[in-house]
Structure formats: structure tokens, C-alpha cells
Curated annotation (Swiss-Prot):
Family listed: Belongs to the RNA cytidine acetyltransferase family. NAT10 subfamily.
Binding site for ATP: R53
GO biological process assignments: rRNA acetylation involved in maturation of SSU-rRNA; tRNA processing
Protein name listed in UniProt: RNA cytidine acetyltransferase
InterPro entries per record: GNAT_dom, NAT10/TcmA_helicase, TmcA/NAT10/Kre33
Segments for region (Disordered): 246-271
Annotated compartments: Nucleus, Nucleolus
Gene3D superfamilies with a match to the protein in the record: 3.40.630.30
Length: 373
């Protein structure tokens, strides 16, 4: 959703035009007799190309950049399968064991995902890659076109139209919430539950289960074509149990690969790191994976008109806007929620529970318009 490849190309072209104009003006200024005698200013552009940590063409630097996806580039692979209608595209779950197996195709697919993050102006660090690889609550979904299966059968990687990173949050006990809020503290993680509980002094919301969109990035060649909205729509249906049959259950022993050792037999001191013999499929249709049933679907982002409009069109409603702006971006952090259909869940909240948060947040925002916003 964020970022536009055409905009970046335009910025580079504008920089080159300004540089050429400034250089021509400087040469003309120096060529005149009046300025040539008295001296003049010379315009120079300095570019740093010498590595500051490694020697030139050091193999360790190349290996490290590939391992941490630091050199995936800001321009993703070109889309070769065309631009299908969003309604023809489907969302797939990415198995992280296969994604981070360092298999040749899996590694190329990971590089494509990280390239989309870079193109969408997300700040990527090695810690973000580690969080993506082994954080239990994080999941990755990709939106693919109808030709994805044909590309896979031909041994080609499918075109990634949109990638969504989701973190499961909530299900915090009332006792833990009350104890943390009474001390003016909050545990790490669970951004939306803790923020809402702290702002509204509500211990009930933190006990609900939900999912937060950590990152969502659309391929820069197809921004504004509805692929991001399609991905959010399918995720909403998925977490409402409308796409997959059954509910999510932890993997049992029978579901483990044959080469995976049990917890009793494994020992970190004796474990031998080796390639796995059997890997699960990299991409799994949502219809083949039971969903985690949730009460809400949310997002937190730096507030802009474009992003607010996007999430509002997807059925999300604003419940929190931070009073102070981010010192780096100058944007106010916003939280928007979408109440999912969860009447069949045992601990489902009363109907219209989100309306109370939205109404209270709107009153606060109106009262602070003359001050902070």
C-alpha cells in the first residue's frame, strides 16, 4: 500500500535535472570574466562507495547481506503474470519453516517479501527478520493471482501482489491487566490490548483475542489496484471462520515430519544442525488451514489521510489517536479495529461493543482538536 515506484523514479530524475542545472550554472558563472578573476563557487557531489566495515568485495559482507536480506534492493521483481482482477486473487498462508529453510526457491521467495517491505518504506533491521522467523504469534500471508498454481507447476516463483504480516494478540487475564495498570506498567507485546486497556481503563478488552496487522505491502507496480483491500477482506473472512472448516489446533505428534525429533529426545547441547529431509509446503491455501477464531481485527499506523481512508473502506473504525506526534515522522499513531463475527465463540462480547469505544474516542478527539491536533 505504501510507496510508489514511479514516485521514487521521479525523485531520482528530479535530482539529476537539478544537479545538471546547478552544474551548468556553476560553469557559466565561472566562465564569465567578472567571476573568473575574483573566483567563484564550484558545485561538487560526493558519493561514498568504499566499505567502512569490510574490504572491497569481501565475501563475508556478501554472505551477511544475503543472510539478513540487507541487499534485497528497493525494487522488487517485475510482475510477469499480468494484473488480474482482485476478485480472482486468493490469499495463501506462508509456512515459516519452509520459508527460512535456506532452500534456493524459499530463499528467493523470502527476498521478494523483504523487497516489498523495502519498497513500501518499512524500516528493516535484523531484529525484524528474526521476529518474522520465529515469533510464535506472527504469521505471514501473501496474495497471489490465479496463475500462481501454473507458475508453481512450471518451477517458477509466483508473483507476490501483496504481503501481510499479522501478530496474534490478546487473551490477557484480568488479574494481569489490573496488576500492570495499577503500577502504571504494561508488558511487552500485545500493543492494541494494552493501549486500549490503558486508555479506556477497561480490563475486559484485553481478555479478547485478536490479530494486529504489523505490516502490509503491495507490489509498487500494482499499487492502488485493490490488491491490499482484497488481502484484508480475505483475512477478515478467514478469522471469522468463513474460509476454512474447523478451528485451529496445535500440531500433534502425528502431524510432525518424520525427521523431527520429539521434545524428550531433543537436547540443545547435543542437537546437530542439518538440513531437514522433509519440509511442509511453502504456500498453503487458507481453505486448507483452520483459522484461529478471533474477536477483533486491528491495525496500528502513523495517521495519514490515505491510510485512514484505506482502513475505513475495509470496515475498520478508529478507537485511538495518540495526542503527541512521532518525533521522527511527525505523524500521530492511530489504532483502528474491526469487530469480527464471533457469536459462536464461548466468550464472545455483547453485540455493539465496538460502538462504545468508537464513541468515546470520537468525544476525546473532538475535545482535543483545539489543543493537540
Amino acid at each position: 500500500i505504501h510507496g510508489d515506484n514511479k514516485t521514487r523514479k521521479g525523485e531520482r530524475k528530479l535530482h539529476e535535472e537539478r544537479w545538471q542545472a546547478a552544474s551548468a550554472a556553476a560553469h557559466q558563472h565561472l566562465s564569465t570574466p567578472q567571476t573568473a578573476a575574483g573566483g567563484g563557487r564550484v558545485l561538487r557531489e560526493v558519493t561514498l562507495e568504499m566499505p567502512i566495515r569490510y574490504a572491497p568485495s569481501d565475501a563475508v559482507e556478501k554472505w551477511l547481506n544475503n543472510l539478513l536480506c540487507l541487499d534485497c534492493g528497493s525494487t522488487p521483481n517485475r510482475i510477469i503474470g499480468g494484473t488480474p482482477h482482485p476478485r480472482e486473487c486468493e490469499l495463501y498462508y506462508v509456512d515459516r519453516d519452509s520459508l527460512f529453510s535456506y532452500h534456493k526457491l524459499s530463499e528467493s521467495f523470502l527476498q521478494r517479501i523483504m523487497a516489498l517491505y523495502v519498497a513500501s518504506h518499512y524500516k528493516n533491521q535484523p531484529n525484524d527478520l528474526q521476529l518474522l522467523s520465529d515469533a510464535p504469534a506472527h504469521h505471514i500471508f501473501v496474495l497471489l493471482g490465479p496463475q500462481a498454481e501454473g507458475q508453481g507447476n512450471a518451477g517458477q516463483l509466483p508473483d507476490v501482489l501483496c504481503v501481510v504480516q499479522v501478530a496474534l494478540e490478546g487473551e490477557i487475564s484480568k488479574e494481569s491487566v489490573a496488576a500492570q495498570l495499577s503500577r502504571g506498567q504494561r508488558a511487552s507485546g500485545d500493543l492494541i490490548p494494552w493501549t486500549v486497556a490503558q486508555q479506556f481503563q477497561d480490563n475486559e478488552f484485553a481478555g479478547l483475542s485478536g490479530a494486529r496487522v504489523v505490516r502490509i505491502a503491495t507490489h509498487p507496480d500494482v499499487t492502488g489496484m485493490g490488491y491490499g483491500s482484497r488481502a484484508v477482506e480475505l483475512l477478515t473472512k478467514y478469522y471469522q471462520g468463513e474460509l476454512a472448516s474447523g478451528e485451529f489446533e496445535e500440531e500433534n505428534e502425528a502431524a510432525k515430519p518424520a525427521d523431527e525429533e520429539s521434545d524428550d529426545e531433543s537436547n540443545l547441547l547435543k542437537e546437530k544442525v542439518k538440513p531437514r529431509k522433509a519440509l511442509p509446503p511453502l504456500l498453503l491455501p487458507l481453505t486448507d488451514r483452520p483459522a484461529e477464531r478471533l474477536h477483533w481485527f486491528g491495525t496500528s499506523f502513523g495517521l495519514t489521510l490515505q491510510l485512514y481512508t484505506f482502513w475505513q473502506r475495509s470496515g475498520f473504525r478508529s478507537v485511538y489517536i495518540r495526542q503527541t506526534a512521532n518525533p521522527l515522522t511527525g505523524e500521530h499513531t492511530a489504532i483502528m479495529l474491526n469487530a469480527l463475527k464471533c457469536d459462536d465463540l464461548p466468550a464472545s462480547p455483547a453485540a455493539g461493543w465496538l460502538d462504545e469505544f468508537v464513541g468515546d474516542a470520537r468525544k476525546r478527539f473532538m475535545a482535543l482538536l483545539a489543543y493537540e491536533f
